[in-house]
Amino acid sequence: MAFNKYQIIKGAVSYELANFIFNYFLLKRDAVKWMYDNNITYDTGMLGTWTDDQIPNTYSHYADPVMETLLMKVLPVMAQETGLQLVPTYSYARIYKNGDALHRHKDRPSCEISTTVN
């Protein structure tokens, strides 16, 4: 574990995979925004939302299937880097826009060990 309580692990996710996921999430955000703008009812649990209290008006999604798959893919890397037997709990994804800032906050206990893909 790193001194600052975080560690950068380069190459844990390939550029190609990260780019695929980024473009997937942009496309999903745009499709959901179109539905929202055209008053088409949709399930925010399945498609995401803009109502996150930490960064309002920014698209986010809890437990997106692609992000859940990514969670399972990086699990062995995280376990090796931490030396811990880890249990995956959940994924959460957000697309930041200019001006967004995620301020210092305290996550729930299930986030004791977490991964950020940037």
Q: What feature does the model see in each segment?
A:
Residues L71-N118:
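Conserved double-stranded beta-helix
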Residues M1-T82:
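Non-heme Fe(II)/2-oxoglutarate
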